[in-house]
Amino acid sequence: EGLLHDAVCDIVGTQFRNLATVGGSIFGRFGFSDVMTAFLALDSYVELYKGGIVQMSEFVKMKRDNDILVRVIVKKCPGHFVYLSHRNTRTDFPVLTVAVSDCGGVKKAVIGARPGIAKLYEIERMDKETAERLAEEAPFQSNMRVSEAFCRHLAGLLLGRAFA
């Protein structure tokens, strides 16, 4: 369905996108990362030289250190996956990112670029009520590009579209 393609196709611009790496985006744990949002929706792991294999959802919570990222692991799972984002301009950093997955009966929703590192939610249903509840519960902040209120509104819209 193109989850990873959709997550990387609009990265800032051609020049930056051609230099960006999946490992760099994940290891950096950047709040604006399209890639991190997508990988959190998947059954994914990182292998660290000293830290071993760590689930992606735990890795994003870890304190930054000088460990080395060896590889990114994605377990195969048939399912449905959607990635959506909103940008002020096509080549800008995302204002908000959303990824959802339904893989083997496990449903996940991820809200990223809030601003802040992407946040994972395990959900029971993919419906309008769940989209509205997540938009209300998720922690958002205002910054120079977007207000907290607009982020909440946008999260509800993007999650609703992704669930449809």
Where in this protein do the model-derived segments appear?
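C-terminal structural segment of proteins
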Residues: 1-164
